[in-house]
C-alpha cells in the first residue's frame, strides 16, 4: 500500500450544485459560538453575559435516537453532528428542524461555521462544506487515501475517518484523517471556498518508515502561534505542525514503543499562547473507561516539558 500517496483535486474533490463563491446570507459575529469550544484555541470562554435565571422554551426530540456532538450556533441556527452520520440545523428560537444532511459515516465533532458555510469531518473519510443556511452541498474532499470501510466500535467507517473536527482560519480549512499511525495519518489545508489543496502532510504517521510509527489522529485540531496542534496518540502527543506549510515540527518516533503513561485524551486547548492543555477521554472509549481513566496534562509551548497533570 502506498501510504504517502499525493492527493489531487481531480481524484479527491467533488463539487456540489450552484456557485461556490455565493452562499445564502448568514450572519456570524463575535458573540456567536461558531466553532467547538468557541474559538480555534478552544478557550471555551465568551464575553456574552448569561442570565442568572433561565427557563426551558423548547425541547428537541429526535425521531430516532443518536449520540449527538456538542453544538455550535450562529445566524439563528444551532448545529449538531451525530453518530448516525447526520448533520442537523435547528431554529434557535423554536427548536424546529431547518435542514439535515447525511454523510457516509459517524460525525464526532460539531460543524465549524465560517462566512455562511458549515464544515464537517465525517467517519466516511470526507471533509464537507455546506451552505449554512440551507444545507446545500458546496464541496466535499476525500481526506482518506482510498475508499475503504472497516467496523470501528460498531459503526462502518473509513480506515481513515476525519475525527479531528474542521478548523478554519484566514480562509483555510484544516483537518486530519486517520485512526492509528500504523495505517497512516493525513493532514490537509484546503481553500475554504473552493476546496482546493493548499498543502498536505501524508508522512507524519510514519516518522519511522520501517516501523510505521509516528503521529496518530486522536483528537480535535487547535491553532496558536502559527502552529497546528493535535492529540497524537500514545507515541507522540501533542503533535505540532507549521500552519503555513504543513511541516511536522515535533519530536521523532523514537523506538516506536507506546508510552504507557502517554495522555491519549482527545481534547486540546491553548492558554495565553504559552501552554498546551491536553487530555480528557480517549478518542475511542466508553463513558466509564476503567482501563485508562482520562486526565489533563499541561505542556509549555517551546520547551516540551510537562508542568503537571490532573
Regions found by a protein language model. Give the residues of each.
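Short, ordered coil/turn segments that flank beta-strands lining enzyme active or ligand-binding pockets
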Residues: 52, 83, 93, 114, ...
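Repeat-blade elements of multi-bladed beta-propeller folds
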Residues: 33, 64-87, 101-128, 155-188, ...
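Aromatic (tryptophan-biased) beta-strands that constitute blades/sheets of beta-rich domains
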Residues: 1-72, 77, 86, 96-103, ...
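Structural recognition of the beta-propeller blade-terminating site
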Residues: 91, 131, 191, 242, ...
Amino acid at each position: 500500500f502506498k501510504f504517502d500517496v499525493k492527493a489531487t483535486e481531480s481524484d479527491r474533490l467533488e463539487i456540489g450544485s450552484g456557485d461556490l463563491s455565493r452562499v445564502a446570507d448568514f450572519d456570524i459575529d463575535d458573540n456567536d459560538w461558531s466553532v467547538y469550544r468557541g474559538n480555534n484555541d478552544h478557550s471555551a470562554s465568551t464575553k456574552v453575559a448569561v442570565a442568572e435565571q433561565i427557563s426551558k422554551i423548547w425541547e428537541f426530540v429526535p425521531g430516532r435516537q443518536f449520540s449527538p456532538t456538542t453544538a455550535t450556533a450562529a445566524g439563528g441556527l444551532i448545529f449538531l453532528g451525530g453518530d448516525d452520520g447526520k448533520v442537523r440545523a435547528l431554529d434557535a428560537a423554536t427548536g424546529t428542524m431547518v435542514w439535515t444532511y447525511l454523510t457516509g459515516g459517524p460525525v464526532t465533532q460539531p460543524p465549524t461555521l465560517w462566512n455562511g458555510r458549515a464544515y464537517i469531518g465525517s467517519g466516511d473519510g470526507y471533509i464537507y462544506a455546506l451552505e449554512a443556511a440551507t444545507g446545500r452541498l458546496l464541496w466535499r474532499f476525500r481526506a482518506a487515501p482510498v475508499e475503504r470501510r472497516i467496523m470501528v466500535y460498531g459503526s462502518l467507517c473509513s480506515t481513515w475517518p476525519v475525527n479531528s473536527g474542521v478548523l478554519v482560519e484566514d480562509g483555510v480549512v484544516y483537518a486530519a484523517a486517520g485512526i492509528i499511525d500504523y495505517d497512516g495519518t493525513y493532514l490537509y489545508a484546503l481553500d475554504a471556498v473552493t476546496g482546493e489543496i493548499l498543502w498536505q502532510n501524508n508522512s507524519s504517521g510514519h516518522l519511522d518508515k520501517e516501523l510505521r510509527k509516528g503521529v496518530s489522529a486522536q483528537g480535535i485540531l487547535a491553532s496558536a502561534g502559527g502552529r497546528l496542534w493535535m492529540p497524537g496518540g500514545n507515541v507522540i502527543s501533542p503533535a505540532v505542525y507549521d500552519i503555513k506549510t504543513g511541516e511536522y515540527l515535533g519530536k521523532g518516533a523514537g523506538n516506536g514503543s507506546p508510552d504507557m503513561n502517554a495522555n491519549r485524551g482527545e481534547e486540546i486547548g491553548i492558554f495565553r499562547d504559552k501552554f498546551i492543555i491536553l487530555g480528557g477521554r480517549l478518542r475511542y472509549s466508553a463513558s466509564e473507561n476503567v482501563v485508562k481513566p482520562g486526565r489533563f496534562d499541561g505542556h509549555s509551548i517551546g520547551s516540551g516539558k510537562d508542568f503537571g497533570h490532573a
